[in-house]
């Protein structure tokens, strides 16, 4: 294969900061259902590369259908890594564990003069490989020698109490996190407890590194080639509905039943099932929970209704997840602030009948340009970063008794029906109070029209200050 030979035989020349030119780290982004695995396999075969999966659920053994793993036959066509190697009962596998193993694999692939192709839908896993953004903490051990994930332990506590403790040890980070965001609050507390250094201080140090930016440290590998597969939302929604139907036809229910019998029955009998950690957070478990736990214990009609309910829920949550993935790409890749932001090349995948000319050939041309040290002829996707917008600003709405994090969210809240309803209610109360005292005073301070105007003016000022 000429392409594979070209990929391995990269000549030495001046390149990134005077270093030898390096092979690219190919990264394929995209929502579920866009064909990321297909493109990765095609590029891997043509370029002699190896595929590194970046999917937080595919690391676990089992549930091959619901986690949409590539088949055993496809894995034989091109070397795949980071699939089916964690015991399903492990609930403490983290992005740090993933990063440590995956970066070592990538460095080994580079050392063998091959191209690593990172592909998957867990975008924060991909971020951990592209940028130096994670903080490594030391796991704690119990007296029995059992390793304990402190973050998981903290998440069992009350969210407001956790946030109060974080405010005492790291007020800067606490001001950026909502008390309901228990995972992030617990993570920040874990960092402080296990290192003695506040989470915000760690982030300041990362930002101060050469190449660092507001979202973390510098690039980990010097020559990333990022491809983003995207499709028309209506087309993708239809495709995802069909994917669920195909998964059902492939044996999804039997896979869930078997896994449920082996791993989850004991937890359910003890009322300790956990759909927040490990493989049990896979899309599909929660949606079919009621169907699986009542199967054989209710009438066929009821069971069939629960099955239909689970199928519809699975389709809806899959489509919501695809939207979330695209938002992450736009916010964390396309409009990422800072100096170490590589270009992202978009590939339109709405019409699969034109895959060869619209996706595969352009992708090959882009990667080959990186291999040869040339700038691709394709134009990268760009989105402007709004420097004035603070996504972690703290706002307290006394009217609604709510904490809002982020300028955009605050502006949206001020325009929301719930806030406007509370504002209207407050105005009525103010006017009623004025009317009650009106007979006792003719002071202009008690003029209802003036109070109404001031209330409207105050709300308008809030909007102007927040938009």
From Swiss-Prot:
> Which sequence positions carry the modification called Phosphoserine?
443, 455
Pfam families named among the record's database cross-references: IPPT, zf-C2H2_jaz
Report which reactions are catalysed by this protein.
Answer: adenosine(37) in tRNA + dimethylallyl diphosphate = N(6)-dimethylallyladenosine(37) in tRNA + diphosphate
Query: Which portion of the chain is the transit peptide?
Result: 1-47
Q: Which residues bind dimethylallyl diphosphate?
A: 32-37
- Family annotation (SUPFAM superfamilies): beta-beta-alpha zinc fingers (SSF57667), P-loop containing nucleoside triphosphate hydrolases (SSF52540)
Regarding protein family, the annotation reads:
Belongs to the IPP transferase family.
What name has this protein been given in UniProt?
tRNA dimethylallyltransferase
């Amino acid at each position: 294969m000429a392409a594979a030979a070209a990929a391995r035989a990269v000549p030495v020349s001046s390149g990134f900061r005077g270093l030898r030119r390096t092979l690219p780290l190919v990264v394929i982004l995209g929502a579920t259902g866009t064909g990321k695995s297909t493109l990765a396999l095609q590029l891997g075969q043509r370029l002699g590369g190896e595929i590194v999966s970046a999917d937080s659920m595919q690391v676990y053994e089992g549930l091959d259908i619901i986690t949409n793993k590539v088949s055993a036959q496809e894995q034989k066509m091109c070397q795949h890594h980071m699939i089916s190697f964690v015991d399903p009962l492990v609930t403490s596998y983290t992005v740090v564990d993933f990063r440590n193993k995956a970066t070592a694999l990538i460095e080994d692939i580079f050392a063998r003069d091959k191209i690593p192709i990172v592909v998957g839908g867990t975008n924060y896993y991909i971020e951990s490989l592209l940028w130096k953004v994670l903080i490594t903490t030391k796991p704690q051990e119990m007296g029995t020698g059992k390793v304990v994930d402190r973050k998981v332990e903290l998440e069992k506590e009350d969210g407001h109490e956790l946030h109060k403790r974080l405010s005492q040890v790291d007020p800067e980070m606490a001001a950026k996190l909502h008390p309901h965001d228990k995972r992030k609050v617990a993570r920040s507390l874990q960092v402080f407890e296990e290192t003695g250094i506040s989470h915000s201080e760690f982030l300041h140090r990362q930002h101060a590194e050469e190449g660092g930016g507001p979202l973390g440290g510098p690039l980990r590998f010097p020559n990333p080639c990022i491809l983003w597969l995207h499709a028309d939302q209506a087309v993708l929604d239809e495709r995802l509905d069909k994917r669920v139907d195909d998964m059902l036809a492939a044996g999804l229910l039997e896979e869930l039943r078997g896994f449920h019998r082996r791993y989850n029955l004991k937890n359910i009998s003890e009322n300790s099932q956990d759909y927040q950690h490990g493989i049990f957070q896979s899309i599909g478990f929660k949606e079919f929970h009621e169907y699986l736990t009542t199967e054989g214990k209710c009438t066929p009609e009821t069971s069939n209704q629960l099955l239909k309910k689970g199928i519809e829920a699975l389709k809806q949550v899959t489509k919501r997840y695809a939207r979330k993935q695209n938002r992450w790409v736009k916010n964390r890749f396309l409009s990422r602030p800072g100096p170490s932001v590589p270009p992202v090349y978009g590939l339109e995948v709405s019409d699969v009948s034109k895959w060869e000319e619209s996706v595969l050939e352009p992708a090959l041309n882009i990667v080959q340009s990186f291999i040869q040290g040339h700038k691709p002829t394709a134009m990268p996707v760009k989105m402007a970063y709004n420097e004035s917008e603070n996504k972690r600003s703290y706002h307290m709405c006394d009217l609604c008794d709510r904490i809002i994090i982020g300028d955009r969210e605050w502006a949206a809240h001020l325009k929301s029906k719930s806030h406007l309803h509370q504002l209207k209610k407050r105005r009525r109360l103010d006017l009623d109070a004025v009317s009650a005292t009106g007979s006792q005073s003719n002071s202009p301070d008690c003029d209802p029209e003036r109070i109404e105007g001031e209330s409207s003016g105050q709300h308008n000022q809030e909007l102007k200050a927040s938009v």
